Swiss-Prot record:
Top-level taxonomic group: Eukaryota
SUPFAM superfamilies the UniProt entry points to: alpha/beta-Hydrolases, Lipase/lipooxygenase domain (PLAT/LH2 domain)
UniProt-listed NCBIfam families: lipo_lipase
Region annotated Important for interaction with lipoprotein particles, chain positions: 420-424
Catalytic activity: a triacylglycerol + H2O = a diacylglycerol + a fatty acid + H(+); a 1,2-diacyl-sn-glycero-3-phosphocholine + H2O = a 2-acyl-sn-glycero-3-phosphocholine + a fatty acid + H(+); 1,2,3-tri-(9Z-octadecenoyl)-glycerol + H2O = di-(9Z)-octadecenoylglycerol + (9Z)-octadecenoate + H(+); 1,2-di-(9Z-octadecenoyl)-sn-glycero-3-phosphocholine + H2O = (9Z-octadecenoyl)-sn-glycero-3-phosphocholine + (9Z)-octadecenoate + H(+)
Gene name of the encoded protein: LPL
Annotated signal peptide: 1-28
Region (Important for heparin binding): 433-437
Protein name: Lipoprotein lipase
Role: Key enzyme in triglyceride metabolism. Catalyzes the hydrolysis of triglycerides from circulating chylomicrons and very low density lipoproteins (VLDL), and thereby plays an important role in lipid clearance from the blood stream, lipid utilization and storage. Although it has both phospholipase and triglyceride lipase activities it is primarily a triglyceride lipase with low but detectable phospholipase activity. Mediates margination of triglyceride-rich lipoprotein particles in capillaries.
InterPro entries, per the entry: AB_hydrolase_fold, Lipase, Lipase_LIPH, Lipase_N, Lipo_Lipase, PLAT/LH2_dom, PLAT/LH2_dom_sf, TAG_lipase
Protein's cellular compartments: Cell membrane; Secreted; Secreted, Extracellular space, Extracellular matrix
Length: 478
């Protein structure tokens, strides 16, 4: 009899040891409604506005009381933040910044951070493969919230960075009903550039998918960020290849000043810029950055795409207009090197006239814009070619809002090297009018020379043009 009691006690201890899971929770409690949630390895921390940096309370799939214990707000929208690959096995510094910005913009919302750090810390190809399992974990969690608490998935916005963007896409493809929105923050390129839609972020994964591409430098499949469009709207700030303030010269300067401690930050500077651009859109609600639809970044650099007709422009970030085109819309914009990132875009068209036929290559100019609010002086630009009796279009941007344009100055910069021909006489062109279109306001302005024609001479004083009246201003904008 005594041996039988000892056997029962041993079996009880054994069963208890088998059913206790991480954090002291009984794994059997994670089997509800016939569904087993014990295979979910990812953790779901509901962070608070008071403590955006710590995972103090976890929502545990299958454990209904965890939702009440964490004070989940069932009547508000929910943001789910999914991090990417990590070298350190720790959250990166952008995570609490994004959480804080989300709460500042939506104080009553729920901001959940998905912890898949143990899987994300592996060699990149291994971690890339784990995105499928992480996506499955997130989908099971969201389906449980919908089934158990009748929480509408239409209130859910997934935000995934790098590998996390693809995990978000996989999650969205597996939920019983579509989530409202997925934002891909520079989705990872290697292992995903040529992947089929079910294995990566795609437009089918949510009611609306918007993507920021910030580090696509390199050949397809080898660039850190994915190059091809994978959403309803894909935005490529500064062409998407590299971001201002993230150059090699800046890296060397920081290393000289601070040592090697910040090298990893500089390497991922452009990649992580996607997150900070989105944070900027949350914090600067009144001044969203505007992006413009264009067939190529080359056409955008010529200023040919600053139209807002038929949804050709859109806000970048949180306040984006949810335009679901039949095919993905590639959009471009310029930004500053630091927050606030917004700039003001202008298309400038100049016709170079003259009696002699001349062509010059790679010519440097400066233009100064003067408006009702401020001015932006000595903006440099280079034209690959300047020929007599041809019109050239190019893109300019200012970091300040100068208001309505009133006047501009144009200067042709002399070559840095000495030339006898330039010593005796420098080339020049006649310019009568300069046409400018402001992207943010869509206003067109024509500037005229004070004379019938102004002679712009290389290396000489700038030429002044003032706002003039022209019947063509009344034509419908294109």
């Amino acid at each position: 009899m005594e041996s039988k009691a000892l056997l029962l006690l041993a079996l009880s201890v054994c069963l208890q040891s088998l059913t206790v899971s991480r954090g002291g929770l009984v794994a059997a409690d994670r089997i509800t409604g016939g569904k087993d949630f014990r295979d979910i390895e990812s953790k779901f921390a509901l962070r608070t506005p008071e403590d955006t940096a710590e995972d103090t309370c976890h929502l545990i799939p299958g454990v209904t009381e965890s939702v009440a214990n964490c004070h989940f707000n069932h009547s508000s929208k929910t943001f789910v933040v999914i991090h990417g690959w990590t070298v350190t096995g720790m959250y990166e510094s952008w995570v609490p910044k994004l959480v804080a910005a989300l709460y500042k913009r939506e104080p009553d919302s729920n901001v959940i951070v998905v912890d898949w750090l143990s899987r994300a810390q592996q060699h990149y190809p291994v971690s890339a493969g784990y995105t499928k399992l992480v996506g499955q974990d997130v989908a099971k969690f969201m389906n449980w919230m919908a089934d158990e608490f009748n929480y509408p998935l239409g209130n859910v916005h997934l935000l995934g960075y790098s590998l996390g963007a693809h995990a978000a896409g996989i999650a969205g493809s597996l939920t019983n009903k579509k989530v409202n929105r997925i934002t891909g923050l520079d989705p990872a390129g290697p292992n995903f550039e040529y992947a089929e839609a079910p294995s990566r972020l795609s437009p089918d994964d949510a009611d609306f998918v918007d993507v920021l591409h910030t580090f696509t430098r390199g050949s397809p499949g080898r660039s850190i960020g994915i190059q091809k469009p994978v959403g309803h709207v894909d935005i490529y700030p500064n062409g998407g290849t590299f971001q201002p303030g993230c150059n090699i010269g800046e890296a060397l300067r920081v290393i000289a000043e601070r040592g090697l401690g910040d090298v990893d930050q500089l390497v991922k500077c452009s990649h992580e810029r996607s997150v900070h651009l989105f944070i900027d859109s949350l914090l600067n609600e009144e001044n969203p950055s505007k992006a413009y639809r264009c067939n190529s970044k080359e056409a955008f650099e010529k200023g040919l795409c600053l139209s807002c007709r038929k949804n050709r422009c859109n806000n970048m970030g949180y306040e984006i207009n949810k335009v679901r085109a039949k095919r993905s819309s590639k959009m471009y914009l310029k930004t500053r090197s630091q927050m606030p990132y917004k700039v003001f875009h202008y298309q400038v068209k100049i016709h170079f006239s003259g009696t002699e036929s001349n062509t010059y290559t790679n010519q440097a100019f400066e233009i100064s814009l003067y408006g009702t609010v401020a001015e932006s002086e000595n903006i440099p630009f280079t034209l690959p070619e300047v020929s007599t009796n041809k019109t050239y279009s190019f893109l300019l941007y200012t970091e300040v809002d100068i208001g309505e344009l009133l006047m501009l100055k144009l200067k042709w910069i002399s070559d840095s090297y000495f030339s006898w021909s330039n010593w005796w006489s420098s080339p020049g062109f006649d310019i009568g009018k300069i046409r400018v279109k402001a992207g943010e306001t869509q206003k067109k302005v024509i500037f005229c020379s004070r004379e019938k024609m102004s002679y712009l001479q290389k290396g000489k004083s700038p030429v002044i043009f003032v706002k003039c009246h022209d019947k063509s201003l009344n034509r419908k904008s294109g």
